């Protein structure tokens, strides 16, 4: 009788379905499943690039992986992330640690990146203006056969009043951010293109689709020119392959790294 009772109880328990509260942060997880299978639940998260609901949201930040390219390296980001505390080793929780340059992946530059007096004065990523980093933005398609010179800037016909512009270039077509080897032939701003931008537009945020908004051969000079002004924010290594030309709402939120001249940044576009 005792054994029979155990069998009946087990069978009854396994047939019970329990409904849990819906967690919209994890839409891939169903809300009803068997208690008996709960411990062996084999759910897989969904990694979105585009969220298509009431509003279309584009994630224009790159994933941080060991293959992510880094400046002047053929090895990529490497093993930047490790599980320092592990439940498998008896701990109560999993805790990861990471080590990487603040200019890795999608990131912003602060004035102290190329100006030591600004670095010493505290012009860090925590001092960047969120009003500039968030708001209406124009995505433009750059001619594919050249860097962004004054001539190219003039040809784009960016109207006055536009404060945030994302430049989609040959870098996106070549998928350079998906290749771990650094490629110095990437498209970027020339010094004269940066000067034309300052003198003829109202742009305060410049977004580009590789590790530097400035072309490789003129990177120091172009960075110095733009960052010296302290009123233009470069956003680098944007992921623009899923996005069409046009107007969007941009949200860029850098980590608040006090004292740092750059910071990893989560950027999204909303249509």
Curated annotation (Swiss-Prot):
Record InterPro entries: KFase/CYL, KFase_sf
Gene3D superfamilies, per database record: Putative cyclase (3.50.30.50)
Swiss-Prot/TrEMBL GO biological process terms: L-tryptophan catabolic process to kynurenine
Keywords on record: Extracellular matrix, Secreted, Signal
SUPFAM superfamilies from the UniProt entry: Putative cyclase (SSF102198)
Annotated signal peptide: 1-21
Protein's UniProt keywords contain Secreted: yes
Compartments where located: Secreted, Extracellular space, Extracellular matrix
A GO molecular-function descriptor: arylformamidase activity
GO (cellular component) term, any one: extracellular region
Coiled coil: none
Family per similarity comment: Belongs to the Cyclase 1 superfamily.
Protein name: Cyclase-like protein 3
